[in-house]
Each structure stands twice: as structure tokens, then as C-alpha cells.
């Protein structure tokens, strides 16, 4: 399947690479299909690219790279919605807001993206009763 991307131009992807956000992503509820594309070979950062909207791509990363103590409890309804039966199948990502200099970039730890890699279903989850924010600086450990 050929898609047009924000950072890589035209690309050929396989159907099994598509991640389904059944309810969309907050602010982009009509966008349901995304694919993860590396930004470079040796970078932990990847693009979460919409399959249908060329200019819609989020820079995401595993939050554990920058925030070693990051933790939260996944609510049962999300685990059921994503059909999670093994924690080994789960990937957690956080959306970044990039800035210059890089150390001023921030991570949205309040609303992580949860992906079940077994069935490629995902959801952005808003953590309730959390001390995390949408703008944690990634320049230093702060959680």
C-alpha cells in the first residue's frame, strides 16, 4: 500500500504495519490508521504517521528512555478494548513537542499511547489522578 508521509515522502507499507486507533486520537478523532516510521537508523524517535493524512505525523518515543521512573496503572476498560492479555505485547509511547534547543522539548506523560503489538490496536489514554503533565521537559529526569 502506497502512502504519502510528512517526513519520508511516498512510501510503500504493508497492511500488517497499520496500527488501528478505533476511537481516533484526541483532537484527531477521524484519524484511525497510523504507522510507525523510523526517523533515522540510530534514533529512538519515530514518526506516528497517519495513513490517510500526509501532513499528520507525531514524533513519539518510549517514555522510559527519558523517564526511567515513569509508571502508571492501565485501566481495565483500555486493557479490554485493546484485548491485552500479555504485558509483553504492550508498547508505550509518548508524543513529543520538539523545541530548539532540543533540551527544551517536552513529552506528554499525561496521555501515553498504548499499543497492543499482537493485534496492532492502540489508544491514547488520559491518566486520571496523575501528577504527570502534557509538557514534561525531556532535558532531565523530572518524574
Curated annotation (Swiss-Prot):
It holds the Pfam family FliW. One of its GO terms (biological process) is bacterial-type flagellum assembly. It comes from the Bacteria. Keywords: Bacterial flagellum biogenesis, Chaperone, Cytoplasm, Translation regulation. One of its GO terms (cellular component) is cytoplasm. SUPFAM superfamilies: BH3618-like (SSF141457). The keyword Repressor does not apply. Disruption phenotype: Greatly reduced swarming motility, less flagellin. Fewer, shorter flagella assemble. Loss of motility and flagellar assembly are suppressed by deletion of csrA. Decreased expression of flagellin (Hag) which is suppressed by deletion of csrA. InterPro entries: Flagellar_assembly_factor_FliW (IPR003775), Flagellar_assmbl_FliW_dom_sf (IPR024046). Interacts with flagellin in a 1:1 complex. Two molecules interact with each CsrA dimer; cannot interact with both flagellin and CsrA simultaneously. Has a higher affinity for CsrA than for flagellin. Interacts directly with flagellin (hag), forms a 3-way complex of Hag, FliS and FliW in which Flis and FliW do not directly interact. Interaction with Hag may occur via the C-terminus of Hag. NCBIfam families: PRK13285.1-1. HAMAP family: FliW (MF_01185). Belongs to the FliW family. This is Flagellar assembly factor FliW. It comes from Bacillus subtilis (strain 168). The gene is fliW.
